[in-house]
């Protein structure tokens, strides 16, 4: 038997099948570096509970713009050869609700409908303590993180994901990658987008068809719909959240194997959501916000997602070291996959 390990520069580097399907994508998200950050949960909770950050920003907290330099960096990161340096968690849906414990903390029912994965206690009042005490749908059970995305609809009927896989990948400064700190919160994507070009973190395609789109494709019989969502790879090293829920994070520069900007010097694994739905054809839409109102008719290019880290710290650190730093593709148990 042998293990799957990262191929070195002299070796051919084929794309893994899951990424080959999305090989037509030519854009990826780079988070704008902005000022004004919050270092602790209590401050964020207090602002949200008093109608501060959550009430003022609402879903405007998801909006962003890309500079030409950042677009170029994103393109380089997306198109560079993908190395075998990752681990994963499979986290079936635990249900849906109109809550968003990052953007609209303490306001149950205020958000458009989200599909929640991972921690079984996630609601509008979720904090790190409740996640630590909760259960999880994830394999491995060491991952008690909360993950969520807008609910998908077909002809007005909510669709439960068939599968949800969360990849943790070593793309930026792999030798120095650090685990995400417990309590880290990240939002990625743009629910206020008016075109696919305004939301390059998200993409859709049909299983088995090597093309990707910012909006819903029409999947033929025999296929099904899937979506990818990419998270940033660099942390500022200080703040577990920020007022816009993104400025404490940034994407690495220089493509795969590149480095973090000085403003965000700590490389972390890139999260990539891979969500599959057993649907095809037309009539697709997302839960979202349009003209200030929650709707179920938002277009595919408004897809976005949230991550609230509650991994067991020792297990996450082990996987980062044994899989990402050491250059292996690992399974759900955090061990190199045998073939």
Label each PLM-derived region with a short phrase.
Residues 31, 40-42, 102-105, 233:
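Generic hydrophobic/packing signal
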Residues 42-54:
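Ser/Thr/Pro/Gly-rich low-complexity linker/stalk segments immediately outside membranes or between
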Residues 51-111, 115-229, 236-339:
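Primary mode marks residue(s) on the alpha4-beta5-alpha5 output face of response regulator receiver
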């Amino acid at each position: 038997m042998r293990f799957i390990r990262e191929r070195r520069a002299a070796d051919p580097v084929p794309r893994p099948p899951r990424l080959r399907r999305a090989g037509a994508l030519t854009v990826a998200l780079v988070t704008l570096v902005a000022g004004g950050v919050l270092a602790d949960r209590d401050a964020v909770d207090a602002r949200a509970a008093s109608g501060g950050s959550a009430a003022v920003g609402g879903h405007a907290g998801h909006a962003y713009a890309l500079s030409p330099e950042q677009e170029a960096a994103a393109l380089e990161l997306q198109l560079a050869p993908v190395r075998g340096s990752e681990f994963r968690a499979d986290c079936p849906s635990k249900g849906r609700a109109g809550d968003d414990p990052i953007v609209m903390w303490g306001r149950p029912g205020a958000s458009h409908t989200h599909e929640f994965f991972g921690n079984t206690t996630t609601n509008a009042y979720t904090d790190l303590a409740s996640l630590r005490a909760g259960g999880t749908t994830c394999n491995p059970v060491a991952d008690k993180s909360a993950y969520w995305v807008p609910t998908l609809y077909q002809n007005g009927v909510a669709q439960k994901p068939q599968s949800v896989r969360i990849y943790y990948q070593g793309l930026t400064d792999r030798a120095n990658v650090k685990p995400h700190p417990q309590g880290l919160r990240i939002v990625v994507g743009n629910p206020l987008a008016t075109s696919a070009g305004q939301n390059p973190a998200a993409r859709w395609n049909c299983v088995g068809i090597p093309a990707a789109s910012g909006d819903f494709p029409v999947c033929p019989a025999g296929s099904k719909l899937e979506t990818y969502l990419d998270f940033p790879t660099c942390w500022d090293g200080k703040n577990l959240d920020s007022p816009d829920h993104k400025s404490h994070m940034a994407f690495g520069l220089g493509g795969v194997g590149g480095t973090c900007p000085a403003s965000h010097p700590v490389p972390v694994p890139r999260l990539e959501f891979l969500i599959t739905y057993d649907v095809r054809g037309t009539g697709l839409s997302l839960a979202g916000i349009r003209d200030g109102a929650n709707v179920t008719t938002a277009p595919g290019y408004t897809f976005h997602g949230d991550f609230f880290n509650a991994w067991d710290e020792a297990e996450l650190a082990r996987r980062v070291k044994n899989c990402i730093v050491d250059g292996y593709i690992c399974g759900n148990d955090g061990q190199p996959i045998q073939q």
